[in-house]
Each structure stands twice: as structure tokens, then as C-alpha cells.
Amino acid sequence: MAQTTNDIKNGSVLNLDGQLWTVMKFQHVKPGKGPAFVRTTIKNVLSGKIVDKTFNAGMKMEFETVDNRTLQYSYEDGDNFVFMDMTTYDQIMVPKTLLGDKAKFLLEGTDCLVSFHDGTPLSVDLPGSVVLTITHTEPGLQGNRSNAGTKPATVETGAEIQVPLFINEGDRVKINTEDGSYTGRENN
């Protein structure tokens, strides 16, 4: 649907030269001299490449409609992850490449937001944080305090993260899915 650059918002999907781009940040700028413009940071939906792009204000551009659905992760099948729509019980194959490094925090039963364009999955967003069980870590030394440093630990999905020295095997920890950082310990 044709609109202008004045309609750009965070999350808008633009069709530029036949490729889909998601607007991550935008700013309408009206300088003292010269015409107004829109400064954006956009992300290529397929490749994940992020670029800064400036558009003249009022310029016509093609916006695309994206369907967002909450799906539950079921299992891995070759080069795909299989998600289930819990309202229709349809199984949907999503290429592993759409998750990238975040796949290491994907646990069976996790609800994810999957974006579709013309029935094709474009992106998968995990929850902001997940709770996983520590399956392997070296024991901390006696007298360690919560701010005394970190050690490597492996969680149930096989991902390796850094945790405080007081964390032990079997502990459930909260992990930020954006950067893989430890954010806290959950009550068992």
C-alpha cells in the first residue's frame, strides 16, 4: 500500500527495491534551512543487515502488511524449527536461519512471536528472557560472594553462558535472550 515517509513508525515494514526492511528507529527532522527529512535505522528482514537511511519528507514509498502470530515451539526438524499455532493446531516450519544465535535459548513449549508476509515466516522473536536449568558448571569456591566474578555454565539447551560463582548445577536461571546474559536466579 502506497504511503509517504511521514507515515513511518517503529516496526513499519518498507518495500525498498523489492526487499523488505523493518524500521528500528526513525526521526523526523526539520532543519532551519532546506527541506524536512526522515532519518531511519532499518533492518533487512531476510539478511538481518542493519543500515541507516535518510528519506525526503513526503516521499512516496511502499509499506507492507505483516501478520504477527504467537506460536509455540514444538521441535527441531532438519534445517527447520516446527512451531504450533495453539488456536488452530497447525504446525508451521520456520527456517533455523531466522532465529540465528537466539536458537540456543529455544526450549520446547516456548511461546514466540512469528512475523509473516504473504504466508512466509520473516522473523521470530523470543520472549525477552527465558528460565533455563544449569546442567553443568564447576563448583564455586567457599566464600564466594554474588559480585565476586563469573564462571562458564551450560544450560539445558546446550548454550554456554557466564553466571556468578554461587550458581550450581540444577539451579534455574533467568537469561536475557537478546545478549545471552545472566539476569537472576529463579526459585526452584
From Swiss-Prot:
Metal-binding as a keyword of this entry, yes or no, is no
Q: In which pathway does it act?
A: Protein biosynthesis; polypeptide chain elongation
Q: Where in the cell is it found?
A: Cytoplasm
Q: Name one GO biological process term.
A: peptide biosynthetic process
Q: Which Gene3D superfamilies match?
A: 2.30.30.30, Nucleic acid-binding proteins
Kindly list the GO CC terms recorded for this protein.
cytoplasm
Q: Name one Pfam family in it.
A: EFP
**Keywords of this protein's UniProt record, alphabetized?**
Cytoplasm, Elongation factor, Protein biosynthesis
| GO MF | translation elongation factor activity
Question: What family does this belong to?
Answer: Belongs to the elongation factor P family.
For this protein, the record's NCBIfam families field holds: efp (TIGR00038), PRK00529.1 (NF001810)
So what does this one do? Answer: Involved in peptide bond synthesis. Stimulates efficient translation and peptide-bond synthesis on native or reconstituted 70S ribosomes in vitro. Probably functions indirectly by altering the affinity of the ribosome for aminoacyl-tRNA, thus increasing their reactivity as acceptors for peptidyl transferase.
What is the protein name given in its UniProt record?
Elongation factor P
